[in-house]
Amino acid sequence: MSGLLVAGTTSDAGKSAVTAGLCRALARRGVRVAPFKAQNMSNNSMVCRGPDGTGVEIGRAQWVQALAARTTPEAAMNPVLLKPASDHRSHVVLMGKPWGEVASSSWCAGRRALAEAACRAFDALAARYDVVVAEGAGSPAEINLRAGDYVNMGLARHAGLPTIVVGDIDRGGVFAAFLGTVALLAAEDQALVAGFVVNKFRGDSDLLAPGLRDLERVTGRRVYGTLPWHPDLWLDSEDALDLQGRRAAGTGARRVAVVRLPRISNFTDVDALGLEPDLDVVFASDPRALDDADLIVLPGTRATIADLAWLRARDLDRALLVHVAAGKPLLGICGGFQMLGRVIRDPYGIEGPGGQVTEVEGLGLLDVETAFSPHKVLRLPRGEGLGVPASGYEIHHGRITRGDTAEEFLGGARDGPVFGTMWHGSLEGDALREAFLRETLGLAPSGSCFLAARERRLDLLGDLVERHLDVDALLNLARHGCPPTLPFLAPGAP
C-alpha cells in the first residue's frame, strides 16, 4: 500500500492544511488520492451520503480534504469522530453513525474496537486509492498515550507509513519541537519519521536556512520544505482554535456578532458571511460586544441546555432580548435555534443523566418546542427559503414542534426579525445568503460565490504546497517508504 502520515509537533500546527494541500497537489498529477484521519475530536462535522443512501457524519476537515483530493467524501476517511459534550464526556461516531459515548476516565476500555475499525477503514481506502494521505492528531510524542494510539504512530506502524512532522514556526521554538518530537519516540517509531515541514514562516528565508541545515544534520532527516504564512488562506476549521472572525476590507461595514458558546459546533456556518465585503464577522462572549451588532448569530452547540445556562449566567440572554426588541435580526442555527424557543425537553438524557427528565425554559423568542430523541438525524435537506432555493445538512437529536405563530423557515421557524433553522450550511448557498442579507440588513447582492471561493482557497493551498514543498520526493516517499538508514535519536521513549 502507498501512503503518508502527516503528523505535527502540536495541535493546530497545520496538519489539516498540509494534508489538504498534498491531496490537491497529488490530484493535479493524476494520482488517485484519499485523505484519512483515524480519529478526530471536533464538534465541526459534516454529513455526506453513505453507501445505502442515508446520511453519515465525518469531521469537517476530512470532508474538505476529500474536496481537495477531487474525490467523494465517505465515512472511511474519518472512521472515529469524538464530539465533546463536556470536559470529561464525548459522543462517539463510528463509521459515520452514532456509537455511544465515552468518559475520559473510561476511554481505554472501548478503544480497541475503535482502533480495529479505524485500521480496517484505512486498509479499505488503501486498496482503492493510489495514495492515502493520513493526518495525525495532536502530537505523536504524547508518550502517555502510546499504548493505545491508533491515529499517529500506531497507525504508521499498522500500515508501515512514512511520516513527516509539521511544525508551526510562527509560535516559536519549532527546532526544539522537531527534535523533541522525534527523540521522544520509540526506536520503531523513529524509523518511520522521514523528515519535517516548516509551516507559517514569515521573513527572510536566508535567515532560516542555517537552522534547517542544522536540523537535518542533528536529526539525520531532511526538511521537505517551508510553507509561508499566507493572509488569504482559510479552510473550514476543524476545532475551536480558529474562532477569530473576519474583518471587511472597507469602511462602513455592518457588524455580525456570533455568540461564542462554550460547546460551539459547526461554526463554519458563518464562514460564508466572512466573504461578504460589507460585513464584519466577530465572535463574542461578552454581552457588551453585542450592543452595536447589526445581526447576531446564535450558532450550533453540542450541549444546548448547558450552553443556554451559560448564556443566562453571563447576561447574554438579556442582550439578545434587547437586540430583538430594537427590531434587529437574530439567527439561531440548530442548538442556537432550539434556545430561541419556549421550552427544551430531554426525557432520554441525551444531554444529561439517563432516565432523568430534564426540561428547561427557552428564551421565548420563537413559538417552538424542542424534545431530544435517542435517534440522531443525519440528512442533506433541500427546499426553499425566502423565495429562493436552499440546501444544507442536519445533525441533531432535537425534534421541533412549531406553534401557531411560527412561520416555517428552513426546517425551523421565523417570527419577524427572529430566524431559526435546523439546517447547517444554508448560508453557503449564494441565493439564500443574498436573500437573507437583503431581508435582514437591506444589503444588495455582492456577487460572492462561496463554492468558488472555497475552490480558490484549495487551489491556493495546492499552489503553495507545489511551490514550497518537494512534492515529488513526498510522493516517492509515500510509494517506497522511509530509507532504512534513519538514525536513532536518544533518549527515545521506553
From Swiss-Prot:
KW S-adenosyl-L-methionine (keyword) present: no
InterPro entries: Class_I_gatase-like, CobQ/CobB/MinD/ParA_Nub-bd_dom, CobQ_GATase1, CobQ_N, CobQ_synth, GATase_3, P-loop_NTPase
GO biological process, one term: cobalamin biosynthetic process
Any Pfam family the entry gives: GATase_3
UniProt entry keywords in alphabetical sequence: Cobalamin biosynthesis, Glutamine amidotransferase
A molecular function (GO) term: catalytic activity
Pathway(s) where this gene product acts: Cofactor biosynthesis; adenosylcobalamin biosynthesis
Record's signal peptide: none
Highest taxon, organism lineage: Bacteria
Active site: residue positions: C334, H424
UniProt cross-references to HAMAP family, sorted A to Z: CobQ
Protein name, UniProt field: Cobyric acid synthase
Organism: Mycobacterium tuberculosis (strain ATCC 25177 / H37Ra)
The gene coding this protein: cobQ
